[in-house]
Amino acid sequence: MGDGALIVAVAIKGNNSKTKGVVRWALQEFASQEHVVFKLLHVQPRDSNSVSTTRKDLTTSVYKKDVDRKTREMLLPSRDMFVHREVQLDIMVLESDDIADAISKAVQDHGISELVIGASSSIIFSWKLKRSNLSSRIADATPRFCSVHVISKGKLLNVRKSDMDTETSIADDRSESRFSSDSHSGTVSSTSSHQFSSTPLLFQRIQALTTVNQKVGTNIGKQNNEPHHHHHNRAGSLDVDESKLLNQKGFYRTSSSGIGYGGSDISSWRSSQMEEASSSSTYSDPTSSSSQIHKDFELEKLKIELRHIKGMYAVAQSEVIDASKKMQDLNQRRSEEATRLKNLTIREEEADEVVEMERERQEDAENEAELVRECIERETEERLEAEARAEEVRKEKQRLEDALEGGPLQRQQYMKFEWEEIVEATSSFSDELKIGVGGYGSVYRCNLHHTTVAVKVLHSDKSSLTKQFHQELEILSKIRHPHLLLLLGACPERGSLVYEYMHNGSLEERLMKRRPNVDTPQPPPLRWFERFRIAWEIASALYFLHTNEPRPIVHRDLKPANILLDRNNVSKIGDVGLSKMVNLDPSHASTVFNETGPVGTFFYIDPEYQRTGVVTPESDIYAFGIILLQLVTARSAMGLAHSIEKALRDQTGKFTEILDKTAGDWPVKEAKEMVMIGLRCAEMRKRDRPDLGKEILPVLERLKEVASIARNMFADNLIDHHHNAPTHFYCPITKDVMENPCVASDGYTYEKRAIKEWLQKNHKSPMTDLPFPSDSLLPNHSLLSAIKEWRSQLIK
């Protein structure tokens, strides 16, 4: 910094519009000058001793850091304004309880030649009459070699020159200094001004007092309009004494602004005085006339100053009350903050103890984790080596198979069985092993490769050996769905298919209460919640077939006889292998009509398919609707839709009579909802049938949830009253049979919901009382399958 640099200090208090106005004025006034250095001053109070003694060193440091951070954030907008103008800036944050003294010392120590400050709220009354505001005290305390600029609303309000001239002028910088008054007061004409050339200072003082009186009167009027009734009473007592003096010269007080004039304002009075002076100059001594004018002026000046003092008194009284209230609030906040600080200190000590304990536990856990990590690394290396060796063996085996079979494209996706194996397993197709006869062939139960399977032997005709049979067999071998009958293998040369065996027969046998054969006992009826679940399973399998890519698969022969049930009454659709892959392009419709006759069972065939021969996914929707009606009623498909519609139209409660009573107590609302879906699916025109994915599946999904809840309640009742589950079926935490068993990292199996809640509150195993190595949970599928099978046996 050069010796000839101009040092300009800008003192700010906070971050508001007043501060921005002060900074903006300083930049506009001094930034264009050469060799100028700006200093941004901010004074913050010192921390009291009472507070510092109650804090610990750590808390005091945190408190100071927080104060410094808030100060930087407060000064940031002002700093950015200086940076934007690309001027040299130093930021000085002073700590002192006396703002004026701190700024004075900074001006003295740094040789500041220009000081820019903001005006206090009460400075509008008078710079000379009120010296108690902060701006005045700063100006008085500042050394005389420094000029002080007082800014209000972005404008220059007052300047204290550095040449020791203490005279100040109170004027609005937007108006020019001229000898004039407003439209209500009139003007002093130039023709009469020569008569008072002997007293120009007198009229200048009258003009200044008039301007000040108007501004102060307006401000006091605003103060009086506010609802401070307790101030008005005291001010009113002063007005009574003042009115006697004002009436002598024609002055009075108005209700709107607090100060007014009767008949004419001060300019009118001034004009009358000039006329009196002019007339008296002819008949009296000029010296005595001038003396009388000075006396009258001094009297009027005292009256105006009296009004100023009373106005400032009212404002000061209001400020004192506000300051007192703020002081009470600050004391209350200080007490609350002290209590809060004490509580925080106690909590901090407790937290330190907990942290120390956790640190010790962490060290122990890290040591244990290190041992586990080393074991895992060794096991991982061994596993990777084993996988690498297995991959090499697999590739070699694959290479040999490709060489033997002529390439990967010729490999079959299903197991090939020799015809002799099938003949031997079925005891030369013994009638004792026959479990069903269909339109395409007979079905036998037998054992192949130590597995119970169902072998369908197609009727021996030429169609079974065509290219279409092999194409459909290839497609079927690639389809996998939980509710589609699984194809295990085939003997393509003889048109034989090998499926997984379904122990509980077909849905038709369970609904119509028919035994598969004479030797088997009568199966129990399906309960209503199982029927809701079966309906959803069939719909999900159909949706899988209909959304197949690149072309949908239509079953064409969907009926209860082709829906099979396993040990747990889980349903699977059979005869998928003889389904039809259709092209939804309308140009192929005639081809389907000419080459394909109606296929399927009469009461389940789509009426439009019967009429046109066109195979579409909606054909399966029609058959599915009939099946839904049979699930609810357990009646024959013939005329079923018509009889149900008739029962629904009857208001005498016949709907409950068509429900299958052997299924238990039906929920009437849900049963009626399923019947309505079935009737919509069985509409005569396919365009009137609902969409499987958007309309049917969401409804059945909701019904399945209702059925799942009812099934669990039914099973729990059986468990509580009649049966005891195996001990490993119970959760160690809830002591109930698990519905979703999961293996935790301690090696024990828990109910998933219960162990998750345990892990949120505890880190030790409820069985071993040792820390969990990790929070991972693995589903125990084998145990879940065993629990489901056990529940199914209970329900049966």
Swiss-Prot record:
Compositionally skewed regions (Low complexity) per UniProt: 182-195, 270-291
Coiled coil: 298-407
Active site positions, chain numbering: 557 (proton acceptor)
Catalyzed chemical reaction(s): L-seryl-[protein] + ATP = O-phospho-L-seryl-[protein] + ADP + H(+); L-threonyl-[protein] + ATP = O-phospho-L-threonyl-[protein] + ADP + H(+); S-ubiquitinyl-[E2 ubiquitin-conjugating enzyme]-L-cysteine + [acceptor protein]-L-lysine = [E2 ubiquitin-conjugating enzyme]-L-cysteine + N(6)-ubiquitinyl-[acceptor protein]-L-lysine
EC numbers on record: 2.3.2.27, 2.7.11.-
Any one GO cellular component localisation term in the record: chloroplast
Biased composition annotated in UniProt, kind: Basic and acidic residues: 171-181
Binding site for ATP: 435-443, 456
Region (Disordered): 163-195, 218-240, 270-292
Residues annotated as domain Protein kinase: 429-700
Keywords for the protein's UniProt record, in alphabetical order: ATP-binding, Coiled coil, Kinase, Nucleotide-binding, Serine/threonine-protein kinase, Transferase, Ubl conjugation pathway
GO biological process, one term: protein ubiquitination
InterPro entries: Kinase-like_dom_sf, Prot_kinase_dom, Protein_kinase_ATP_BS, Rossmann-like_a/b/a_fold, Ser/Thr_kinase_AS, U-box_ubiquitin_ligases, Ubox_domain, Znf_RING/FYVE/PHD
PROSITE patterns registered for this protein in UniProt: PROTEIN_KINASE_ATP, PROTEIN_KINASE_DOM, PROTEIN_KINASE_ST, U_BOX
Chain ranges of the U-box domain: 724-796
One Gene Ontology MF term: protein serine/threonine kinase activity
Annotated metabolic or biological route of this protein: Protein modification; protein ubiquitination
Alphabetical list of PANTHER family matching this protein: OS02G0152300 PROTEIN, U-BOX DOMAIN-CONTAINING PROTEIN 51
Primary role: Functions as an E3 ubiquitin ligase.
UniProt family annotation: Belongs to the protein kinase superfamily. Ser/Thr protein kinase family.
Name of the protein: U-box domain-containing protein 51
